[in-house]
């Protein structure tokens, strides 16, 4: 599918995708991507490094892995003879090149695999070299970047090659434990033991356009199952749809995307130590000045909160934040379109943003399931907030959902458990969290993104245990009583501010956000900054303790509200 880029003095090259005859210099100028069909040719490690890192910045690691022939393997040739031939043909010592470099000025340790060397297979020496690169990243506290190209474990080294999956994985685990970022770049092909270890257990997984990745190769799958495989099976685009990778990036954009990720990783705050801060007290109820929206009719507010012209999460990200890089997938087989999230810049600070996404048109709403997250959506959000905690990034959540997906599939896939795990994780997340209810805050689907240090709410948003229609159908029972139910539920921003559920109400441009979306976006940006910045210097232990205290106050013994009180 993706033949190796031609070497030496060849003047012409035939594309492996469309069979076009291409002038070699033109192909090289286009980064070995066919200008006719976009097929990406395979690159050797040297060419890959030249495209990704800053000129002159790469320094190879001084260590050289020992020669190994652990089991004396012989097929038609002794294994050492195959190693000699591979070294002669590639000029490499092994199937990976490791060192340190900068990408757009950001330091990293980097390991680049080369498929030309015995199919990029993972043997003891390759595992040792990548592990040393990870250990260098840990020692220097710089991100690790791994560019994969491999057919899998090296058969000639027997089960010891299998052990390299664990060896490198535990080196990645050490990076996670220490909060040192790791990023993998999947190139064609990435299979077997490499795919099932360090290629996919990094913090962020990028895939070059057209790259194929899987545990078993397509030929094996056909033989075992006796079935034909779907078009595009195991390609980067297939993997994205099935939640396996964060991004699919064409080669010309790969360096830029990598630079943005490294910049975000470098901008994370280190854990703040020390004792408690007496001036930080999220247990206090909001002041009357913070509670706007007095006198608004609850049912009319519901209608405004649902207006399709209100800004969506992607609208807020487009103009209220800078440099958004969306990260996809739950890593378990799906990418829910009702939840979007990723890395963004807020006034020079990298943040993780996660939110529900609805849309403005009927087609958009249907494609996004009206902002109703599936279990995959909640698990994607969970993965991203955990990543934020590891990288030391604050979290901003934007809540706009009528509720979690109530379908049969969602129940079969563990909707309740997915929501529960989000709530549990957010209660102890060791990084600042600011949540904004921007439209509808529907029940547990909303709370799954709204357990936060500060909860803000737009003036004409709503937040409720159930929709007014649902409440009316159950308790009246008459769906036409929805307006009456809305008033009884106390779901407006002013009501919830008085109850202490939200900390502040964000004013909307008159008469509501959909009349002036840019102004609404700016108001949210300013409010998030005002509430987030003071949290950045709070010691982690204090932050978590105060967040727990914030939600503990909603117990019956602490509310101080008499039965039947209005």
Swiss-Prot record:
Source organism of the structure: Salinispora arenicola (strain CNS-205)
Boundaries of every CoA carboxyltransferase N-terminal domain copy: 11-280
- The CoA carboxyltransferase C-terminal domain sits at 282-534
Where is the segment annotated Disordered? 268-292
State the oligomer form and interacting partners.
Acetyl-CoA carboxylase is a heterotetramer composed of biotin carboxyl carrier protein (AccB), biotin carboxylase (AccC) and two subunits of ACCase subunit beta/alpha.
Q: What is the primary gene name for this protein?
A: accD
**Residues annotated as region Carboxyltransferase?**
11-534
Q: What is this protein called?
A: Acetyl-coenzyme A carboxylase carboxyl transferase subunits beta/alpha
Lineage, broadest ranks = Bacteria, Bacillati, Actinomycetota, Actinomycetes, Micromonosporales
Q: Output the GO biological process annotations, alphabetical, semicolon-separated.
A: fatty acid biosynthetic process; malonyl-CoA biosynthetic process
Q: Where is the signal peptide?
A: none
